[in-house]
Amino acid sequence: MTSPARPAALSDSQLDRVEGVLLGQAVGDAMGAPYEPGDIPFTGTPELLGGGFGDYAPGEWSDDTQMSLYIARVAATGADLTSREALDEIARGFCRWVALDGASDVGVQTRRVLGAVVDSRDEPGIAARMRAAAADLDAATRRTGGNGALMRNGIVGLTRLDDRWATAASARAVAELTHADPLAGDCCVIHAEMIRSAVMGPPWRGGHLPAAAAAMRALDLIPAERRNYWRDLFDGGILSDSRCLEPPSGDGFTVHALGHAT
Protein backbone atom coordinates (compact mmCIF):
# COMPACT_ATOMS: atom_id res chain seq x y z
CA MET A 1 0.00 0.00 0.00
CA THR A 2 1.22 3.51 -0.81
CA SER A 3 2.57 5.46 2.18
CA PRO A 4 2.53 9.28 1.79
CA ALA A 5 5.08 11.42 3.58
CA ARG A 6 4.62 11.65 7.34
CA PRO A 7 3.53 15.01 8.80
CA ALA A 8 5.93 17.15 10.76
CA ALA A 9 6.39 16.18 14.40
CA LEU A 10 3.39 17.04 16.55
CA SER A 11 3.64 19.08 19.73
CA ASP A 12 2.63 17.61 23.07
CA SER A 13 -0.58 19.62 22.88
CA GLN A 14 -1.39 18.25 19.44
CA LEU A 15 -0.66 14.69 20.54
CA ASP A 16 -3.03 15.20 23.46
CA ARG A 17 -5.71 16.22 20.99
CA VAL A 18 -5.06 13.17 18.80
CA GLU A 19 -5.45 10.93 21.83
CA GLY A 20 -8.58 12.85 22.78
CA VAL A 21 -10.18 12.09 19.42
CA LEU A 22 -9.57 8.37 19.76
CA LEU A 23 -10.43 8.04 23.44
CA GLY A 24 -13.32 10.47 23.14
CA GLN A 25 -14.94 8.37 20.43
CA ALA A 26 -14.64 5.17 22.44
CA VAL A 27 -15.81 6.69 25.72
CA GLY A 28 -18.59 8.71 24.12
CA ASP A 29 -19.75 5.67 22.20
CA ALA A 30 -19.83 3.52 25.33
CA MET A 31 -21.67 6.27 27.20
CA GLY A 32 -24.22 6.83 24.45
CA ALA A 33 -24.92 3.22 23.48
CA PRO A 34 -27.57 2.55 26.16
CA TYR A 35 -29.50 5.66 25.16
CA GLU A 36 -29.62 4.80 21.44
CA PRO A 37 -32.90 2.83 21.51
CA GLY A 38 -34.58 5.79 23.21
CA ASP A 39 -36.17 3.78 26.02
CA ILE A 40 -33.96 5.03 28.88
CA PRO A 41 -34.82 8.44 30.36
CA PHE A 42 -31.99 10.94 30.47
CA THR A 43 -31.45 12.26 33.99
CA GLY A 44 -29.02 15.03 33.09
CA THR A 45 -25.81 13.07 33.62
CA PRO A 46 -24.95 10.29 31.14
CA GLU A 47 -23.97 7.02 32.78
CA LEU A 48 -22.15 3.92 31.56
CA LEU A 49 -25.23 1.75 31.88
CA GLY A 50 -24.69 -0.90 29.24
CA GLY A 51 -27.54 -2.33 27.20
CA GLY A 52 -28.56 -0.66 23.96
CA PHE A 53 -29.08 -2.43 20.66
CA GLY A 54 -26.05 -4.68 21.17
CA ASP A 55 -26.80 -5.58 24.80
CA TYR A 56 -23.47 -4.05 25.73
CA ALA A 57 -21.74 -4.38 29.07
CA PRO A 58 -21.37 -1.10 31.01
CA GLY A 59 -18.44 0.73 29.46
CA GLU A 60 -18.35 -1.40 26.30
CA TRP A 61 -18.17 0.53 23.04
CA SER A 62 -20.55 -0.26 20.20
CA ASP A 63 -20.39 -1.31 16.58
CA ASP A 64 -19.36 2.20 15.51
CA THR A 65 -16.05 2.08 17.38
CA GLN A 66 -15.62 -1.57 16.42
CA MET A 67 -15.74 -0.56 12.75
CA SER A 68 -13.43 2.40 13.28
CA LEU A 69 -10.74 0.03 14.55
CA TYR A 70 -10.60 -1.69 11.16
CA ILE A 71 -9.97 1.70 9.56
CA ALA A 72 -7.40 2.55 12.22
CA ARG A 73 -5.41 -0.63 11.63
CA VAL A 74 -4.99 0.24 7.97
CA ALA A 75 -4.33 3.92 8.67
CA ALA A 76 -1.63 2.98 11.19
CA THR A 77 0.45 1.49 8.36
CA GLY A 78 0.68 4.95 6.77
CA ALA A 79 -1.38 3.81 3.80
CA ASP A 80 -3.17 6.26 1.52
CA LEU A 81 -6.81 5.56 2.40
CA THR A 82 -7.91 6.44 -1.12
CA SER A 83 -5.77 3.68 -2.66
CA ARG A 84 -7.32 0.49 -3.95
CA GLU A 85 -5.13 -1.59 -1.66
CA ALA A 86 -6.07 0.31 1.49
CA LEU A 87 -9.78 0.37 0.68
CA ASP A 88 -9.72 -3.36 -0.09
CA GLU A 89 -8.14 -4.01 3.31
CA ILE A 90 -10.70 -1.83 5.10
CA ALA A 91 -13.58 -3.47 3.22
CA ARG A 92 -12.18 -6.92 3.96
CA GLY A 93 -11.92 -5.98 7.63
CA PHE A 94 -15.56 -4.88 7.71
CA CYS A 95 -16.56 -8.23 6.22
CA ARG A 96 -14.43 -10.19 8.68
CA TRP A 97 -16.03 -8.20 11.48
CA VAL A 98 -19.49 -9.36 10.42
CA ALA A 99 -18.56 -12.92 9.47
CA LEU A 100 -15.92 -13.89 12.01
CA ASP A 101 -15.09 -11.27 14.64
CA GLY A 102 -18.35 -11.08 16.55
CA ALA A 103 -20.00 -7.85 15.42
CA SER A 104 -22.23 -6.93 18.34
CA ASP A 105 -24.74 -4.97 16.27
CA VAL A 106 -24.82 -3.75 12.68
CA GLY A 107 -26.90 -0.88 11.33
CA VAL A 108 -29.62 -1.85 8.87
CA GLN A 109 -28.03 -0.10 5.89
CA THR A 110 -24.51 -1.30 6.62
CA ARG A 111 -25.75 -4.85 7.19
CA ARG A 112 -27.41 -4.93 3.77
CA VAL A 113 -24.30 -3.68 1.99
CA LEU A 114 -21.90 -6.01 3.80
CA GLY A 115 -24.28 -8.92 3.40
CA ALA A 116 -24.14 -8.52 -0.37
CA VAL A 117 -20.36 -9.03 -0.52
CA VAL A 118 -19.27 -10.85 2.63
CA ASP A 119 -18.99 -14.25 0.94
CA SER A 120 -16.48 -12.87 -1.59
CA ARG A 121 -14.42 -10.96 0.96
CA ASP A 122 -11.17 -12.77 0.17
CA GLU A 123 -11.40 -12.26 -3.58
CA PRO A 124 -9.65 -9.31 -5.27
CA GLY A 125 -11.60 -6.07 -5.67
CA ILE A 126 -13.73 -6.32 -2.54
CA ALA A 127 -13.86 -2.52 -2.09
CA ALA A 128 -15.19 -1.98 -5.61
CA ARG A 129 -17.86 -4.63 -5.07
CA MET A 130 -18.81 -3.09 -1.75
CA ARG A 131 -19.18 0.37 -3.35
CA ALA A 132 -21.32 -1.18 -6.08
CA ALA A 133 -23.54 -2.84 -3.47
CA ALA A 134 -23.91 0.51 -1.70
CA ALA A 135 -24.79 2.20 -4.99
CA ASP A 136 -27.34 -0.51 -5.80
CA LEU A 137 -28.99 -0.02 -2.42
CA ASP A 138 -29.12 3.73 -3.00
CA ALA A 139 -30.67 3.26 -6.45
CA ALA A 140 -33.27 0.89 -5.02
CA THR A 141 -34.24 2.85 -1.93
CA ARG A 142 -33.00 6.44 -2.28
CA ARG A 143 -32.55 6.24 1.50
CA THR A 144 -28.87 5.64 2.16
CA GLY A 145 -28.09 8.75 4.19
CA GLY A 146 -27.78 6.86 7.47
CA ASN A 147 -25.24 7.94 10.06
CA GLY A 148 -23.10 4.78 10.03
CA ALA A 149 -20.22 6.17 7.96
CA LEU A 150 -20.06 9.30 10.10
CA MET A 151 -20.05 7.35 13.36
CA ARG A 152 -16.83 5.51 12.45
CA ASN A 153 -15.15 8.53 10.82
CA GLY A 154 -13.14 10.08 13.66
CA ILE A 155 -9.92 8.22 12.91
CA VAL A 156 -9.93 9.45 9.30
CA GLY A 157 -9.52 13.04 10.47
CA LEU A 158 -6.14 12.08 11.96
CA THR A 159 -4.61 10.35 8.96
CA ARG A 160 -3.45 13.30 6.82
CA LEU A 161 -2.97 16.09 9.32
CA ASP A 162 -0.83 18.22 7.00
CA ASP A 163 -3.21 18.00 4.03
CA ARG A 164 -6.86 19.01 4.26
CA TRP A 165 -7.61 17.92 0.68
CA ALA A 166 -6.13 14.47 1.24
CA THR A 167 -8.09 14.22 4.48
CA ALA A 168 -11.30 15.06 2.62
CA ALA A 169 -10.60 12.54 -0.14
CA SER A 170 -9.89 9.83 2.42
CA ALA A 171 -13.08 10.58 4.35
CA ARG A 172 -15.25 10.35 1.25
CA ALA A 173 -13.53 7.22 -0.06
CA VAL A 174 -14.03 5.32 3.20
CA ALA A 175 -17.61 6.56 3.59
CA GLU A 176 -18.55 5.44 0.08
CA LEU A 177 -17.69 1.84 0.87
CA THR A 178 -21.09 1.53 2.57
CA HIS A 179 -22.92 4.84 2.09
CA ALA A 180 -23.57 6.04 -1.46
CA ASP A 181 -25.67 9.09 -0.58
CA PRO A 182 -23.46 12.13 -1.31
CA LEU A 183 -24.64 13.77 1.92
CA ALA A 184 -23.12 10.90 3.90
CA GLY A 185 -19.79 11.55 2.21
CA ASP A 186 -20.16 15.30 2.76
CA CYS A 187 -20.76 14.77 6.48
CA CYS A 188 -17.62 12.67 6.76
CA VAL A 189 -15.58 15.27 4.86
CA ILE A 190 -16.79 18.11 7.11
CA HIS A 191 -16.34 16.07 10.27
CA ALA A 192 -12.83 14.90 9.32
CA GLU A 193 -11.74 18.44 8.51
CA MET A 194 -13.13 19.72 11.80
CA ILE A 195 -11.03 17.10 13.59
CA ARG A 196 -7.92 17.77 11.50
CA SER A 197 -8.11 21.52 11.99
CA ALA A 198 -8.77 21.17 15.73
CA VAL A 199 -5.67 19.01 16.13
CA MET A 200 -3.44 21.24 14.02
CA GLY A 201 -4.78 24.56 15.26
CA PRO A 202 -3.69 26.61 18.28
CA PRO A 203 -4.15 25.16 21.78
CA TRP A 204 -7.63 25.46 23.23
CA ARG A 205 -7.73 28.12 25.93
CA GLY A 206 -11.14 27.26 27.30
CA GLY A 207 -14.50 28.75 26.51
CA HIS A 208 -16.67 28.03 23.49
CA LEU A 209 -15.43 25.61 20.84
CA PRO A 210 -16.47 27.22 17.52
CA ALA A 211 -17.92 24.10 15.90
CA ALA A 212 -20.15 25.97 13.45
CA ALA A 213 -17.30 28.18 12.27
CA ALA A 214 -15.04 25.15 11.79
CA ALA A 215 -17.74 23.37 9.82
CA MET A 216 -18.31 26.42 7.64
CA ARG A 217 -14.60 26.61 6.84
CA ALA A 218 -14.78 23.06 5.50
CA LEU A 219 -17.33 23.89 2.82
CA ASP A 220 -14.73 24.49 0.12
CA LEU A 221 -14.04 20.74 0.36
CA ILE A 222 -17.64 19.99 -0.64
CA PRO A 223 -18.70 19.88 -4.32
CA ALA A 224 -19.89 23.31 -5.41
CA GLU A 225 -23.42 22.16 -6.20
CA ARG A 226 -24.08 21.27 -2.54
CA ARG A 227 -22.32 24.10 -0.71
CA ASN A 228 -25.42 26.27 -0.51
CA TYR A 229 -27.34 23.35 1.00
CA TRP A 230 -24.80 23.09 3.80
CA ARG A 231 -24.41 26.83 4.23
CA ASP A 232 -28.16 27.20 4.68
CA LEU A 233 -28.19 24.43 7.28
CA PHE A 234 -25.34 25.95 9.26
CA ASP A 235 -26.86 29.41 9.07
CA GLY A 236 -30.14 27.93 10.29
CA GLY A 237 -28.56 26.60 13.45
CA ILE A 238 -28.02 22.90 12.84
CA LEU A 239 -25.00 23.17 15.13
CA SER A 240 -26.88 25.10 17.81
CA ASP A 241 -25.45 24.62 21.31
CA SER A 242 -28.93 23.87 22.64
CA ARG A 243 -28.87 20.51 20.90
CA CYS A 244 -26.15 19.29 23.27
CA LEU A 245 -28.26 19.61 26.43
CA GLU A 246 -30.04 16.26 26.10
CA PRO A 247 -29.79 13.14 23.93
CA PRO A 248 -31.22 14.01 20.52
CA SER A 249 -34.06 12.18 18.85
CA GLY A 250 -34.16 11.29 15.19
CA ASP A 251 -30.44 11.45 14.48
CA GLY A 252 -30.34 8.39 12.24
CA PHE A 253 -30.05 10.77 9.27
CA THR A 254 -26.39 11.62 8.86
CA VAL A 255 -26.96 15.37 8.57
CA HIS A 256 -28.82 15.45 11.89
CA ALA A 257 -26.16 13.28 13.50
CA LEU A 258 -23.41 15.68 12.44
CA GLY A 259 -25.25 18.57 14.05
CA HIS A 260 -25.90 16.65 17.25
CA ALA A 261 -22.33 15.40 17.49
CA THR A 262 -20.81 18.85 17.22
List each model region and its residues.
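Structured, active/binding-site neighborhoods that engage oxygen-rich ligands
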Residues: 1-262
